[in-house]
Amino acid sequence: MALHALTFLTTCITAVTVVTASSSTQLPFKPLPDLFSLTVDDIITGFSTNQFTSADLVSAYIARTAEVQLALRPVIEINPDALLIAQTLDNERLIQNRTRGPLHGVPVLLKDNIGTADQLNTTAGSYALYGSIVPHDSTVAANLRAAGAVILGKAGLSEWAFWRGTNNSNGWSARGGQVKGAYYDNQDPSGSSGGSAVAAGLGLTALAVGTDTGGSVIDPANINGVVGIRPSTGLTSRAVVVPITVVQDSVGPITRTVKDAAYLLSAMAGPKGDPGDNYTNAIPFTTIPNYASYCIPSGLQGAKIGIPRNIFPAPVNYTESDIQQIDAFNAILPLLASLGANVTDNADYPDIDAYNTEAQFTLALDIGFKHDFPAYMSQLKFNPTGIEDLADLLNWTQTFRAEQYPLRSTDFWENSLACNLTTDSPDYLAAIAHNAYLGSNATIQGALDAYGLDALVLPTAYSVRPAVFAGYPVITVPLGYFNATTTVVQAGGGGDPAVWGLNTVAPGIPFGLSFIGPRFGEAQIIQFAYAFEQATMIRYQNLPLAKYMPVTQLHTPVAQAEFECPDALGLPK
């Protein structure tokens, strides 16, 4: 376990040898792919034609991360063994002529709340977990290793997946500092998986993984111009993942393309009946689907798609942001029809009034975290802070300077501790059951059934919240960008301006389109999203700001990368 401070970037990329594609047996005249747009299929081709190796990829990704880390902080920590693992996988493929799985040699960046039993820390961005040792790999990490992936490192995130307090900013953590997006200066990365989305979008990794309790995969993917999938709750195991609540937590892919997300989801998912997560018992198949096989250009042919417009705000309340996103959405509806979809407009949610007035989002998280956090802590092999429960965590956080209390609040935890309900309380169980109704028959399932639909489609900003209550899958794919005359809007919640103030709406910032399907209907919504993506390729119509675009490529000769670690996290001296 790496216990030294600021361990991101292999001890901040101090004297890391970067092996470039020139070290491989490269076929002549074959151009190397750009890492900004590199796909898993490109990697498979590059490996099979000896254009480059896994070690080449890892080295280039580390160098690219070093180029943007000070400005954007998308990565908390690089796996100090990543290059060695990549070289081992290269040897297996090239010398032993064997592969471990479909992602053999492909680098993957994990959000820093996903447990790994290696030299990486798993901290949810907090020093409260720094140096802790998990009992074993999370099921997701173990699945990825079995598929042959290289765990490249840990991505920045909103501390505790933004379950700490209202006066905080998306993407900030004590360990990682402030993650920022790359499409506008001081861009809000959204959260809580902002680091994963920024890293995927800039080509700092082949693939990235986030977690989603209330939109934390979908929202960052939406605002950073990438693809995100919030899987059905239970399709991906939460074993050895720092929790908020098992009722809503999900672990999902964040990638540059739909097909890459499909590859990643197949590798991550399951198994059915994982002993570390009983929600996996609900998986309706014994073999995880090959989701990439559903990525066909004609995937919308005959699809029955509905638009539940009553989830939108009343037109009189539209903001400039609403207008641009809904206008862009309306503009692509003829395209969906031309691709063969049968689009039913105004396929509205049947009990939208109940959803709007009766949802108890915070109660589920208040009680869930108070219960599930101690369970996570109890399984650690080493717990250097001695924190056992939420009361301990609150007291520790309020006294450790790097956690920036009281500038950054802890009121979520205070409210949770003040609530006398437990996960066995009838009032809590009733609230969870009602939330499940509000996310299913009152909204998503109700509309699917009433109109005989395969899926729903919405601008991403309006798509995810009902789904989290009942565990429905959502995929987001780029739809557009705010135009050049857009008024800049800053995040705000009445808190300290030193904490708030990131730009959430601004010229050039992306926004997405979401498909929502029935429980465990990932295959169909992946199929629909892929067909839309291939017909539009909107991700490449606007690029991040040039100053935030890494320049290192596979062909870039870099002998060594020297990177000075800034003391920007407020560590005690």
Q: Which residues are covered by each model-predicted region?
A:
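Gly/Ser-rich catalytic/binding loops embedded in alpha/beta enzyme cores
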Residues: S22-G214, S232
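Short helix-loop capping/hinge segments that flank enzyme active sites or metal/cofactor-binding pockets
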Residues: P31, H104-G125, G299-P313, L363-G439, ...
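Structural recognition of the beta-strand scaffold that forms the well-ordered cores
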Residues: S37, S54-V58, P74-I76, P107-L110, ...
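Immediate post-signal peptide segment of exported/extracytoplasmic ligand-binding proteins
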Residues: A55, L89-P107, D260-A262, Y294-P308, ...
